């Protein structure tokens, strides 16, 4: 049977307040600022921040955006933590529940993210000394017990795979129905993980802490076949 491919696009160009409202801020500090500057979100986070796209994602899909860590002498201009969660949810009674629900504890603290099941990539974490990929398993014991924290599945520590100041990175994340998820940055494949228990439905969040970052060109591409 002939296969036809249909591409459905959800585009976020940050052109209006309505578009900005598609993002939900989960911040540890009340001093956090997410401002709209032209076609770009300008994010100042004195402490932990998860910026959630409110619409859930379903595999197969591709996530694309451009991001920059600003180092221009400001109080939060620290070169670190261009991170993200994808296909994130809170499992409740066998169902994938939105991390944005009021019933879900969301403080902006990084340790509270262990309540999620998701994929996580920390690019230039730990003061720009590591780039790491993990799969979170919603083990809430990990919040207080390091022994329960998810293992590192992929790690880079060389300078070629750490952050450069004021550089605009192109990020592409692919989620396939067969359990494969891929993370590319500037067209370089950093992660190709085959998950034996695939996460095919969930939410995306841009994650950072104590930094000044910019985000633009948000796009989700769905491919469906028949």
Language-model-detected regions and their locations in the chain:
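Short carbohydrate-recognition loop motifs
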Residues: 32-49
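Carbohydrate-binding surfaces in secreted/extracellular proteins
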Residues: 65, 162-193
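Bacterial Sec-dependent N-terminal signal peptides
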Residues: 1-22
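Beta-strand-rich interaction surfaces with strong enrichment in secreted/lumenal proteins
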Residues: 49-56, 157-162, 205
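Secretory/extracellular carbohydrate-interaction modules
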Residues: 48-144
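Flexible glycan-contacting loops in extracellular carbohydrate-active proteins
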Residues: 193-216
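Short, aromatic/His-centered strand-loop micro-motif at the edge of beta-sheets
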Residues: 144-170
């Amino acid at each position: 049977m002939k296969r036809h491919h249909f591409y459905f696009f959800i585009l976020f160009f940050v052109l209006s307040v309505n578009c900005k409202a598609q993002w939900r801020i989960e911040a540890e500090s009340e001093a956090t600022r997410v401002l709209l500057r032209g076609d770009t979100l300008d994010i100042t986070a004195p402490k932990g921040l998860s910026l959630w796209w409110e619409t859930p994602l379903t595999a197969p899909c591709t996530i694309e955006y451009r991001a920059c860590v600003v180092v221009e002498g400001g109080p939060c201009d620290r070169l670190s933590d261009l991170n993200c969660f994808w296909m994130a949810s809170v499992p409740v009674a066998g169902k994938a529940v939105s991390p944005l629900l009021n019933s879900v504890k969301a403080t902006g603290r990084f340790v509270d993210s262990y309540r999620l099941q998701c994929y996580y990539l920390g690019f230039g974490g730990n003061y720009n000394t590591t780039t790491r990929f993990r799969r979170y398993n919603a083990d809430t014991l990990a919040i207080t017990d390091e022994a329960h924290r998810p293992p590192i599945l992929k790690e880079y520590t060389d300078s070629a795979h750490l952050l450069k100041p004021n550089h605009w990175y192109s990020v592409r994340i692919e989620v396939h129905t067969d359990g494969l998820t891929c993370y590319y940055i500037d067209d370089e494949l950093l992660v190709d993980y085959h998950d034996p228990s695939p996460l095919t439905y969930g939410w995306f969040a841009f994650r950072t802490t104590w930094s000044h970052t910019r985000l633009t060109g948000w796009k989700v591409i769905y491919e469906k076949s028949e």
